[in-house]
Regions:
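Solvent-exposed adhesion/ligand-recognition segments of exported proteins
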Residues: 2-12, 16-131
Length: 131
């Protein structure tokens, strides 16, 4: 018996959420940073990761590539940008989807691009000037 068309997206969303929840313990903080524009540094302390960015010359944004970008449950990933008007553009180049199961914060705007997909889980929090 086929699912009605309106149930298919819900079924897909539930399947993705289940996959992320079961993989939650294996998820790691963002990794494999490559700076394309501006500057960025990463510091870790326990389950907290801080990414400090500065804008490209004459620009109001930084551009970063990541091999992987997920935020595990119980962890915090914080972007510190020059101002609330700054934007950090983050592109995932690896094959895995991004799962936001912990807390992702920024004093500025964040753009997260992942062709494999992005999911914010039930315990996931995104607190930014714009996402």
């Amino acid at each position: 018996m086929a699912f009605p068309a309106c149930a298919r997206p819900r079924s897909l969303a539930l399947a993705l959420a289940s996959a992320f929840m079961s993989a939650g313990a294996a998820l790691a903080q963002p990794a494999g940073l490559q700076v394309l524009q501006g500057a960025a540094s990463v510091s870790a302390s326990g389950k907290n990761l801080t990414i400090t960015t500065s804008n490209g010359a004459g620009l109001n944004h930084s551009a970063l590539n990541w091999q992987s970008f997920s935020v595990p449950a119980g962890s915090v990933t914080r972007f510190e940008q020059p101002s609330a008007a700054s934007t950090s553009i983050n592109r995932v180049t690896g094959a895995d989807p991004s799962a936001i199961l912990g807390t992702l914060t920024s004093n500025g705007k964040l753009v997260l691009v992942n062709p494999a997909g992005i999911a914010v889980g039930p315990g996931g929090v995104v607190d930014t000037a714009g996402f």
